[in-house]
A protein has these predicted regions:
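Conserved catalytic core of the tyrosine transesterase superfamily
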Residues: 1-301
Length: 301
């Protein structure tokens, strides 16, 4: 797909920052999700603000930006999100003949250690649900949120973007299309009941299309979701609790329960197995049980 802009081939009529809107429009036409386009915009804006109008961009500028980022966002993962956005942008700019050289060429990604994600235990999940159910005004909503995330491993942004049409009670399915492209995710009977129970009490806001709303009837946002988790964490005493951890917990549970990597990859909406493998976390008890179930030695007499 080639973007048709007003620039002439082989020329650089504007500073690199001025072609960012063309790049973002290209991404939209290509069908990338609003989440992805917004992410690119945020990271590119930050980089060009750092440059303060300097042009043309050089590899040295990019290395200095990495150093600047390291002081403010020490996590290598955060730095690499910026670098991936820049890499995609400059590759596009060269392919479209807006730039002759790619300043990202030879600039390495930041080395990051592989992290194992420790999921919530069944006991912690039960405490979380029990606490949510006791909340008078938002108990039905929060219960539905917890069950849906643990059942489907959906992204927080996908959950907040759900509309009334996306929840298909007759088919026991939800449709998500915020971050990883459109997917149809099955839901269990317990989750279906929780969603239906919440929906019956949500009728106070009949004109709002968003499935999950705040107490004021506005669509639930990811920051609202984090606030819900913060409140539940304080009440339950669970050491760590954030929306993504529910997704991690779901993915790990499916893998420990015997689901194959391809099934979990499709559930999570990942494009590669490398990302999915980060969710594989077996504690010693899980490992021992898996070994007893699957070792060929146990099949010998």
């Amino acid at each position: 797909m080639r973007f048709c802009g007003t620039f002439k081939e082989g020329k650089i009529p504007y500073a690199e920052a001025e072609i960012v809107p063309y790049f973002l429009r290209f991404c939209e036409l290509k069908g990338l999700s609003p989440f992805t386009v917004s992410l690119y915009k945020e990271k590119l804006d930050r980089f060009f603000r750092f440059l303060q109008g300097k042009t043309p961009v050089t590899s040295q500028d990019l290395l200095e930006f990495i150093g600047w980022l390291r002081e403010r966002q020490p996590a290598p993962e955060s730095q690499n999100i910026h670098l991936r956005s820049l890499k995609i942008f400059f590759r596009w700019a060269v392919a479209q003949s807006y730039l002759k050289k790619n300043p990202m060429h030879g600039v390495p990604m930041v080395r990051q250690r592989q992290k194992l994600i420790t999921p919530l235990t069944i006991s912690e999940l039960q405490r979380l649900l029990d606490c949510a159910r006791k909340t008078k005004q938002t108990g039905y909503r929060n219960t539905a949120i917890i069950l849906l995330m643990v059942d489907t491993a959906c992204w927080p942004g996908e959950l907040c973007s759900l509309t009334l049409r996306d929840v298909r009670f007759e088919e026991n399915l939800i449709r998500v299309d915020e971050k990883c492209g459109q997917r149809m995710l099955p839901i269990s009977p317990s989750t279906r009941r929780a969603l239906f129970t919440y929906l019956r009490r949500r009728k106070a806001f009949p004109r709002e299309d968003a499935f999950f709303t705040t107490r004021h009837g506005t669509p639930l946002q990811v920051n609202n979701l984090q606030e819900i988790m913060d409140q539940l964490q304080r009440r339950t005493g669970i050491p760590r609790l954030y929306p993504y951890l529910l997704r991690h917990t779901a993915a790990s549970s499916y893998l420990v329960g015997g689901a194959d990597l391809e099934t979990v990859r499709r559930l999570l909406g990942h494009t590669t197995y490398t990302i999915t493998q980060r969710y594989v976390h077996l504690n010693q008890g899980d490992l021992a049980r898996a070994q007893r179930r699957n070792s060929p030695v146990n099949q010998l007499r």
